[in-house]
Structures are given as structure tokens and as C-alpha cells.
Design a protein with these regions (language model features):
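Short, intrinsically disordered, charge-balanced linker/junction segments flanking boundaries
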Residues: 1, 188-189
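A long amphipathic alpha-helix within ATP-dependent nucleotide-binding catalytic cores
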Residues: 53-75, 84-90, 95-186
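Active-site nucleotide/adenylate-binding loops and adjacent lid/helix of ATP-dependent enzymes
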Residues: 1-76, 80, 85, 89
Length: 189
């Protein structure tokens, strides 16, 4: 509790789970002097009991995402899923596709499509987002269903450098032929 109060927020992640299963964000509400799980205030006793009840987990320090992501939906971490493939002839990596994953009120604190998050294609040349789709109901969203913020037409900042950086990273893993990356853009890049 002291660490949470000092840092302000942490992600609590269970080992061996995928697709955002069991992930919660722990924050501290300084005005109410109380911890929160997934943005809901709880008592200090409930917080301690929650930690005691879960013994196979780790904490990850929360990162502040780029403001363009907060403008779309600020209650979840919204990542880009990059797929890089190695060309079998040239042995050079290429960005095969990229999507912006966007959380919803159903997925707090994560953006996973398998939990009801949205997925918008990113134009590989321009870095501009398409409309978003929900894998659960196949609905199409030009604006975020919870925040009302535009999705379609939004420019991913620093797109060209981001693509270049992904290829540099992929080249550092020469034994890989297919890599799926989940990237969080921050103000620093």
C-alpha cells in the first residue's frame, strides 16, 4: 500500500494468463486517501485481502500513454499491435500490418479485443486510423462508443519513426521470422 501511494498506479498481472485475463490497474485516490482497483475505490483492508488472495502475480509500473491515446479513451492502456515478417528471399523484416487497439468500459484497464476492445487498422504508409471494429459484436465505430472521441482519420504521431524503430528491433532477433509486438506510444515515443 505504501508503494502504491508513493507511485500512484501499478498494473497487477497474473502469471500464465493471456488476453488481459485477470489484469487490473491499482491506483491511489489521493483526495479520498484510498486505494482503487480498476478505478473503483476500495478500503485498505479490501486492498490487503485482494493481494493476499492472489499469490501468483507480479506488479508492473504503469506508463503514461501519449495524449492522442488519452483523447480517444483514457481509462485503458491503448497499444499498437505490429506484425513483422521476415522476407524469405531478402531476409529483411517488413511491417506486415498494424492495428491500434483501444479499450472500452468493458475492458478496463486493458485494450484486448477478446474482452470487448476495439481494433482500428493503421494505414501502413500514412499512420492514419480506419474506423474501429469490435470483435464481440462486429459493430463498426467511427467514434469511440464510450468517450465519443473520433477514431477514424486520427493520425498516429511519429508513425514513420515508429515503423523504422520496429524494423530495427526486429533485426536484433535474426532467428525470428514472425513477431507480434504490442507497443505503447508515450510522449517520448
Amino acid at each position: 500500500l505504501t508503494l502504491l501511494k508513493e507511485k500512484g498506479s501499478y498494473f497487477f498481472k497474473p502469471y500464465g494468463k493471456g488476453k488481459g485475463t485477470g489484469v487490473v490497474i491499482m491506483t491511489y485516490d489521493y483526495e479520498k486517501d484510498t486505494p482503487c482497483i480498476d478505478l473503483k475505490p476500495i478500503t485498505k483492508e479490501e486492498f490487503i485481502n485482494y493481494l493476499k488472495k492472489h499469490d501468483d502475480w507480479f506488479l508492473s509500473e504503469a506508463m503514461k500513454q501519449h495524449h492522442f491515446l488519452d483523447e480517444i479513451y483514457d481509462k485503458t492502456v491503448n497499444t499498437i499491435r505490429f506484425i513483422t515478417l521476415k522476407d524469405p528471399k531478402t531476409h529483411q523484416f517488413k511491417v506486415f500490418f498494424a492495428v491500434q487497439r483501444i479499450g472500452t468500459k468493458e475492458t478496463i484497464p486493458v485494450d484486448n479485443g477478446s474482452r470487448g476492445g476495439l481494433v482500428a487498422n493503421i494505414d501502413l504508409e500514412t499512420g492514419v486510423l480506419s474506423e474501429a471494429r469490435c470483435l464481440h459484436n462486429r459493430n463498426v465505430y467511427k467514434v469511440h462508443p464510450d468517450s465519443g472521441a473520433p477514431i477514424e482519420g486520427v493520425q498516429v504521431p511519429g508513425w514513420q519513426k515508429l515503423k523504422e524503430d520496429m524494423l530495427v528491433l526486429a533485426d536484433k532477433l535474426p532467428y525470428m521470422h514472425f513477431i507480434a509486438w504490442d507497443i505503447l506510444i508515450t510522449e517520448e515515443g
